[in-house]
Amino acid sequence: MPVVWPTLLDLSRDECKRILRKLELEAYAGVISALRAQGDLTKEKKDLLGELSKVLSISTERHRAEVRRAVNDERLTTIAHNSAFFFV
């Protein structure tokens, strides 16, 4: 039998599905945070989120919750406010 690298872990199919879902949710949350920190939501960013939500199987409810989280995050709001001056 050939050696596989990296080594495959002893994870069940259910564990793999659970881990994958967690990665998808974290990735979407990270993109939402980054886009919020960049400032205004442009049409291109909205389109990107639409595509990502499809690819990562993000429900409308989850999308709305992530947007609420990001909009109410003081750190992200501060970064967005201050980054407006980076490009002046």
Task: Describe the function of each predicted region.
Residues 65-88:
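Eukaryotic compositionally biased, intrinsically disordered low-complexity regulatory regions enriched
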